[in-house]
Amino acid sequence: SCSTIYLGSSNQQYFDEINQPNELGEVVNIWEDGARTDDSKNQFEWWYFDAELEDGSLVVAYFYKVHFLKDQFFIGFNYTSPKGEDFFQLKYFNRSDVFFEKDSCNVQMKNNLFRGNLSKYEIKLDPKNFDNFGFDLNLESSVKPYRPQDGIIRAGDDYFAWLAAVPNGKVSGSITVDGKTKNIEGTGYHDHNWGNTPLQKLFKSWTWFRGQAGPYTVILSELNAVNSRGGFDIPILYVADEKQVYVNKFGNSELLTMKNSLIKDFYPKRNEPQFSNFSIVSVDNFSVQISGNQVIDNIEIFDRMSLPMPFNLFKPIINLAFKGSNIDPFYTRFASTFKLQLRDGQVFDGTGVMEIMDLQ
């Protein structure tokens, strides 16, 4: 993005694509969506859910635990109405109010819940915690869970991990908006991330996408490593339907990525270039071409940052310190269209969501 900030020793190991953890096998186990961190310093973990509802509204929620300056536990909630109106809130919880299970996904923060077994999930947000916004939803998976190899991308002792527990599923239940509750249906997605070092020490940025084209679910990403970790890009592609997985590929030996359509108006000029069109091709001739058409969200992270007591008293100073360090992370989310071309040449049109995270 901008000039380099000191993120620790320069003696940092590069990513080695060939020798990444690959011992768990193809079958994802229920325990893998349970808590994977032990609260050691610099660890973090989150369980993420999003849904596109039949009325055109969008829901995003994430249950987060981080262990940087101190142990912190919070839920972020974003609701976009059918008219495009946006509501966002971040709520922090005390350690005595939270619970994390290791054997399966069972995360509780007061009366808020994220619980499931890779097939079915309950996700609940208490409207009392979120200014009369909330939901009580069920997510039922229609596609097998996915991770690239073991899901752990490691550079020396430092790592970032990702499990797409529900690549695509059916959503049902109720949602409360401004204190009024209604029943809803739609489609949804759930993934789980964890790691043991600040992300800026591993990546400059990433592009991530999920979408549906005909019967096919597509997930892809490209992680852009910082120079001290090799400075190269790490592509990932997954294509599946309800019956089988067609593509499960990771790394530059199997995937080629291309970008175009420079994003001109969303970021400071000193930031690294980011692009709203993204393509990926596998060595066995599957390809995905994405066009980011409509901006759903464009966030300067520090402007949205919410801090618990007592740190919120010093938020202006903390923000100024970060900005003075020339770090200006942005998060942009696009409603997207895409084309999926299968190995036999068949082409399917679809829609999805693409996100760009500029970490520095």
What kind of feature is each model-predicted range?
Residues 4-360:
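Structured soluble/peripheral alpha/beta segments that form catalytic or ligand/cofactor-binding pockets
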